[in-house]
């Protein structure tokens, strides 16, 4: 699923509730540079086998709300720049399965994580 919606700059809203992601291992750049995307519902994504989420939402500068409540990141080894270029006003819904997120995931994020 890497690069699946990469560069879809006119995409404003996306609901992928019914996507079967059980066997997916790579989600790198999946939504990269979807600059008009404001809302993204991934609440049923199975990420148990995913190892790469690098730049997954990078450049989604209009994104205001994202539902990651089903995400399990236990096997993810690369989250670099996952939210790079995202608005600092983004609302993220996550649960306890989201682990091991390092600061690199927010590299070049529009907000200062050190404050």
What are these regions (language model features)?
Residues 2-115:
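Negatively charged
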